[in-house]
Every structure is written in C-alpha cells, then in structure tokens.
Amino acid sequence: GQAKLWRQKNSTVFAVLLIAITLNFIVTPTYAKNTELEGENYAPSSSSFQKPANVHTKNDTDTVGYFLGGGIQNSFNKESYPAFSGDQPLYTPYRSGFRFLGWYSDAALHKQIKTIPTDRKDHYILYAKWTAKINNYYNVEYYNYHKRESRFDKNLVLLKDLDYSFYNEIDIPGMPDTREEDVLKKYIFSASQCPQGICLTDEFVLITSYSTEDDCMGELMVFDRETGEYMVTLGMDENSHLGGIAFDGDNVWVCNSYENCVERISYDFIELMAYQNTGDVVDARDVVDEFPVKNTPSCITWYGGRLWIATHTLLVNSRMVAYYLDKKTDKLIALSDYKIPQKVQGVTFDDSGNVYLSTSYGRNQSSYLYCYDSVTALATRPKHPRKKVEMPPASEELDVSDNTLYILFESAGEKYYEGTDGKGKSLFPLDKILKIPIRELDVNGSSTSGT
C-alpha cells in the first residue's frame, strides 16, 4: 500500500513538473516579447549573443576612456558617442613641453587609431602618445660635430658657429607638433611626410613633400611668404620623390624622378589656387606638363636663364646638367654637363654666381653645405669648395633669397623621427627651415644678394 501511495505522489509531482516546463517554453518568450526585451538583454551573461547590425535602441552609445599620459584633454574628445553615428574624429590634447604623436588602442602604443568607429555598441580605451618637443636651436648647438676634422680643414666651419636662425613663421605640415591636426584639416594626405624641396617667390614659400604610404599623392604646399600662413596644397604624382622645386619667373618646375622628368606648373595657376581655394587640397596632377630629361632629377634650381638639374649618387661623383627651354618647340635642351660631389640633395645660385650645394645621407650622419665661387670652380674641383659647413643630418633642398640661404631638412619627417622604416630614429631632428645669412658664408669675400 505504501509503494502504491509513493507511486501516486511521484506521478503527481512528475505531472506538475511537466506542466511547469511546458509553461516555461510557452509563457517566457511571450513575456519577453510583451516587455520588449531585446535579445541582447534577454540572453544570459554567459551567452555569445551578438546584436544584428544596425539593430539598437535609442539609448545605445559607444563609450571611450582616455589615458592622457600627463596631458590635458581636448574638449572636442567626448566620453560617449551615439551608436551608428559614423566614424568620430579624434582631437589633439595638450601637454606642456611635449608633442602629441597620436591616439593608440593598446598600452604598448603600437596600434594607432585615428577615428572612433560607431558601427556597433562598444567601449574603447585609448592611450595618448607623446614625445619631447623638438628644440631646433638645441639640436644645432649640441649636435655631435666632427670637431677633430674642423681643426685640420681650414675651410670647414660648424653651423653652430655661424649666425643662423629659423623661419619660425612657417609650420611645415606633417611635422610632429602639428601632424595629427594637419591630417584632420586636410593640409596633407597622410601623416607620413618627408619634406624635400623648397623655393621662394615674392609672394610665396613653396615646399614639396612625399608620403611614405602607398598610393598617397605627394604635396606641393604653398605658404604666404610674409606671414607664414598656410594657403593651399596641390596634389602631385603619388609615385614621385618630389626632390626639388624651382621658379623661373613664369612657371614652377618640380622634379619627378619616377618618370625621369620635370613637371611644369603655371605660377598663375598656383597663385589662383592660393587665393581662391585657400585652405583646400587641389589635385593638380592633370594640370602639369612633363618634360623628359637626360639625368635623374633629384633637385633643381633656376639661374641665368637655365634650369640646373642635379642627380643624387651615394658613392661616386654626382652630375648636374644645365637645360635651356626652347620656346618654339617647348622642349628642354641639354647644354652643359658638370661633375658635382656625391650625396647632393639641393643646389642654388646667388646673384653673383656663387654656387651652394646641400649634401646628406642618413638620419644620423652629418649634412654638409658646400660653397663655391662659380660653377666653373664647382666643375673643376667638386671636392674642394671654398667653404664647407657641417650641419645636423638630413638636409634637403635649399634656395637663396634676399641675402639669405634657406635650407629644408627631412629629419623630423615621420620615417626618420619615429623610425617607422626600422632603421632607427633621427637624434637631432630639425622641423623648421634653416636660415643662414650669405655674409656668414663669405664665399668670395663680399656680401651678395640672392633672388
């Protein structure tokens, strides 16, 4: 009798459990639906549920945490953004005595992030990367010059012993201090810039630069000469090194070593873009005329009605060829060929015919400025300049204007400053245009005036 009673009780319990389980499968989904629980909220904490794309509530947000590393936050950087509101830009914070190098998504500062994606609900932790600001005067004064060599070479002087200065009015886009903002403002096409060429006109300072990123246009950047204000960027051939730039009074000439040619751009066009498209980036690749040349165009200058185009070599003497523009055929005619020192990066003349060469190779090897009395003196004794100036590494092109020599450096470009190519970092970078009065060089014993 007890066994029968036990079986009846257990049958009753089993029936109740069966009814409860059945109701759980029927009632619970209905309850969830009626209370408008979304799948993400309804799923247990151990669930791997992922919300389908573009399915979200009006309260969904992407949250962001910032590690500023001693800096002060930019008020435009928010701690939350509405989900699915598009990529949100990141802005530059401030830290006294330091330059901001970007936001990173990992504490090791390897994975840079330039925008916050909001295509799904997420939480981001970002880390600010900093580096000490470049002190140009310090890097000139405390560079490790070859002092022993200067004692034995009476024609060699050190830059720190000259009355030099910097063109502080111009902030070159792509330099560490402004790199991130320059990209946001679209002054440049990428943050990976290598400044190459410089040319001065009455109205403007023109600077060329290439990007180390693939398929990214190079730049011809235009600045107001008096104020240093950035005016406009002209997009150039993405494959070109853009090693040099020159002005002949009517046109601007730019080196294109990739095509083994020089490109001509009307100065009127540059002037028009600078004043009517101020602050813009203009693709100028279709408005240039190409002129093939017989030597690889590494750098260029205009003097005496001729284009002087030099080729960079590493171990043997370089060469420089003078070209004449035949206006009837609109072709460049090679006239004279000259031997010049290796490692040439820039060439220019002053009004008296004195020649100045910028030579360099390597981010931690000295640059040298060579000064000659004439092109004949250069051609006959290329390794024996009248005066030689040792400078910090990575000098590029140079130009003469108003009794002053202007020299551009690439050592603060991302590839060298950050060592992104794996070949080390530049230890004494310069991010401003160097200025040396012609009288300091005293090539032929008298002050001269350049253009």
Task: Tell me the role of every PLM-derived stretch.
Residues 186-191, 234-238, 288-293, 336-341, ...:
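Surface loop/turn motifs at the tips and blade-to-blade linkers of beta-strand repeat domains
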Residues 338-377:
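Loop/turn-rich, solvent-exposed surfaces of beta-rich toroidal or solenoidal domains
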Residues 182-215:
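Beta-strand-rich domains and repeat architectures in extracellular enzymes and scaffolds
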Residues 192-197, 239-246, 292-302, 341-348, ...:
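Repeated scaffold domains used in trafficking and secretory/extracellular systems
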Residues 134-185, 429-451:
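Sequence/structural signature of beta-propeller modules
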Residues 379-401:
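Conserved blade-ending motifs and adjacent loop-strand segments that build the rim/top face
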Residues 215-220, 260-268, 316-324, 364-373, ...:
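Structural motif
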Residues 35-135:
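Secondary-structure capping and domain/repeat boundary segments
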